[in-house]
Design a protein with these regions (language model features):
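Structured catalytic-domain cores with a bias toward divalent-metal coordination
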Residues: 1-249
Length: 249
């Protein structure tokens, strides 16, 4: 979404649209939706495979992972998981089939195109390690799909499989203030464990607000900015899962 990129934002300054939320798009509904419609009608139907290299943006940072929207039939899901494993990121994070029906991933599912997405870092910066994971992963996936020949495939540890938790287990800011995190990416946390503290601004006599995790899980993303407002997302949690739990054995 070129106008959004120039504005260093997810949403276009032309119409406020987020390209990864408006698929399948409609050319009558503004430039962002028109762009999604072009991709959905003219590009995706010509593809067998697709990749989308994401990061956490300016507001969050992710553990390096491939990210799968768990839609499509059984064979389609298996093909996506195989592509994600070939990519070689340390984790495969899986979201529910209805997590974001307006994403490019969901559109690829609707059209039977095998798509692998990623979350590689974030914070509005370029991290050399994440860049290396992305470059090597693209080459490995292309070799797996038979598009590149003779690409070296170094032995990699099998990625861990994680199912993204719903909002019920996601810590949110309960007040405005400055957030002090108590945990890091990839930490395993327990129900009731402290996630961090929010220090109110302008109310120096008010005690900090402790934020607690509302269930166990593994941290796959965390907020970057210190200043938070009530309702801001602070962490994303995921739970270990195996192929039996995914229903593909």
């Amino acid at each position: 979404n070129y106008p959004a990129v120039l504005d260093a934002a997810r949403c276009s300054p032309l119409d406020g649209g987020n390209l990864n939320r408006v698929f399948p798009g409609d050319p009558r509904l503004g430039p962002t939706s028109a762009l999604a419609a072009f991709v959905a009608r003219e590009i995706i139907p010509r593809c067998r495979y697709a990749m989308d290299l994401h990061s956490g943006g300016k507001s969050s940072v992710y553990t390096p992972c491939t990210y799968l929207h768990w839609g499509g039939d059984l064979a389609h899901r298996r093909a996506k998981l195989e592509g994600a494993r070939a990519f070689g990121a340390p984790s495969v994070v899986i979201s529910g089939a209805t997590a974001n029906a307006g994403s490019m991933t969901a559109e690829c599912d609707r059209q039977g195109v095998v798509m692998v997405s990623t979350e590689l870092g974030g914070g509005g910066t370029i991290d050399r390690r994440m860049l290396g994971i992305g470059r090597d992963g693209v080459r490995r996936a292309l070799a797996h799909w038979g598009i590149l020949r003779d690409h070296p495939k170094p032995e990699l540890a099998a990625p861990r499989l994680l199912m993204l938790q719903g909002k019920g287990g996601t810590p949110m800011a309960e007040t405005d203030g400055i957030f002090e995190p108590a945990c890091d990416l990839d930490d395993a946390v327990e129900d009731g464990q402290i996630a961090g503290r929010i220090y109110p601004i302008g109310e120096l006599d008010r005690a900090p607000c402790d934020i607690l995790f509302r269930g166990p899980g593994i941290i796959v993303s965390r907020r970057v900015g210190s200043l938070v407002r009530r309702g801001d997302l602070l962490y994303n949690l995921a739970s270990p899962v195996d192929e039996a739990g995914l229903g593909i054995t």
